């Protein structure tokens, strides 16, 4: 079977990203799972290896050489990218120069995917404040990725812990705005997006649970009717599309139903509704997937940890999980061709 090719970036070099990449690629079994293309400042990569006390062999190639390059098992390649910002990096803090570098390396990785050189992208933790200083015009990277890929359909952040995936109909909005932003189409789109992502990650016939909005699932309209007027009609559309969907389940019993029914994915109505339980289940193993974007893109579900830069105490568990999902989804892209 042909291996997928994954682009890997350092995220924000002022944080723990370079250390995490070094620790990840020091593992031979990781390097052999996929063909790996590092998009990074060579000096920052080497600093990460020095911090982590972790070494691995890589080969340096240019962007245009990659199309004819024959990968060697367990040997990543590096496309070295120097930031266009004139100032050097300042470690352990939010800076414009880090933000510029983050956006530039992600653009290179996206271009690799557009050219068909890689099937997925995994980036080390980045900092949104730095990215805004560096030119990001969107509230988060998800909508920036949508712009960069000319994607105008529904997108949402997916959270993953172990074998449980989660999506949400609404996300980074005030609590008072949740109900006005719920719709039958939104519920269906979210279910459908989660279903497609699970299939791309190699899950056959995924089971998806949907959460109710109101206490006790609305109690037949006594505590609210959104379950009847919005959520259930959206679920019915999903069933007609051939998706195996269950619920709507009250928020406080959803995890029990996930375990009982062996659910693969959960659709919630708002940001913290299911992610709280998911993070309790395994915060240190959490992964974020940029849901809906035509290129599979993953990262660890934690931040840059500026205070840990240079200390060699960053734990790579979540980043390794993110890389593994990128490999699986990249394989799904190959299998679709």
Curated annotation (Swiss-Prot):
A Gene Ontology molecular function term of the record: metal ion binding
Residues reported in the UniProt entry to bind a divalent metal cation: 172, 216, 271
Subcellular location: Cytoplasm
Annotated metabolic or biological route of this protein: Cofactor biosynthesis; pyridoxine 5'-phosphate biosynthesis; pyridoxine 5'-phosphate from D-erythrose 4-phosphate: step 4/5
Main location group: cytoplasm
Anything else known: The active site is located at the dimer interface.
The reaction(s) this protein catalyses: 4-(phosphooxy)-L-threonine + NAD(+) = 3-amino-2-oxopropyl phosphate + CO2 + NADH
Similarity field: Belongs to the PdxA family.
EC number: 1.1.1.262
Official protein name in the record: Putative 4-hydroxythreonine-4-phosphate dehydrogenase
EC class name: oxidoreductase
Cofactor entry: Zn(2+); Mg(2+); Co(2+)
Known partners and oligomeric status: Homodimer.
GO BP field: pyridoxine biosynthetic process
Keyword match Isomerase: no
Swiss-Prot/TrEMBL keywords: Cobalt, Cytoplasm, Magnesium, Metal-binding, NAD, NADP, Oxidoreductase, Pyridoxine biosynthesis, Zinc
Described function: Catalyzes the NAD(P)-dependent oxidation of 4-(phosphooxy)-L-threonine (HTP) into 2-amino-3-oxo-4-(phosphooxy)butyric acid which spontaneously decarboxylates to form 3-amino-2-oxopropyl phosphate (AHAP).
């Amino acid at each position: 079977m042909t291996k997928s090719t994954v682009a890997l970036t350092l995220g924000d070099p002022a944080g723990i990203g370079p250390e995490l990449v070094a620790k990840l690629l020091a593992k031979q079994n990781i390097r052999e799972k996929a063909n790996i293309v590092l998009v990074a400042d060579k000096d920052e990569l080497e600093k990460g290896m020095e911090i982590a006390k972790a070494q691995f062999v890589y080969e340096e190639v240019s962007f245009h050489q990659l199309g004819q390059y024959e990968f060697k098992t367990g040997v990543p390649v590096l496309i070295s990218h120097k930031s266009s910002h004139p100032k050097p990096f300042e470690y352990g803090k939010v800076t414009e120069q880090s933000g510029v570098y983050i956006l530039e390396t992600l653009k290179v990785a996206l271009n690799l995917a557009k050219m068909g050189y890689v099937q997925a992208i995994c980036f080390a933790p980045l900092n949104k404040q730095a990215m805004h200083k560096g030119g990001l015009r969107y509230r988060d990277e998800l909508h920036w990725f949508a712009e960069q890929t000319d994607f105008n359909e529904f997108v949402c952040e997916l959270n993953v812990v172990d074998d449980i995936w989660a999506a949400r109909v609404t996300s980074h909005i005030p609590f008072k705005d949740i109900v006005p932003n719920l719709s039958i189409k939104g519920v269906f789109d979210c279910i459908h997006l989660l279903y497609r992502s699970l299939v791309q990650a190699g899950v056959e016939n995924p089971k998806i649970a949907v959460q109710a909005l109101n206490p006790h699932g609305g109690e037949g309209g006594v505590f609210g009717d959104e379950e009847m007027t919005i959520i259930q009609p959206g679920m019915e559309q999903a069933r007609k599309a051939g998706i195996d969907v269950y619920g709507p389940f009250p928020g406080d019993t959803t995890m029990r139903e996930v375990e009982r029914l062996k659910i693969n994915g959960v659709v919630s109505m708002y940001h913290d509704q299911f992610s709280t339980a998911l993070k309790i289940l395994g915060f240190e193993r959490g992964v974020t997937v940029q849901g809906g974007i035509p290129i599979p893109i993953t990262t660890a579900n934690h931040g840059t940890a500026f205070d840990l830069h240079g200390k060699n105490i960053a734990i790579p568990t979540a980043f390794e999980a993110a890389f593994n999902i990128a490999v699986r989804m990249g394989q799904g892209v190959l299998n679709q061709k």
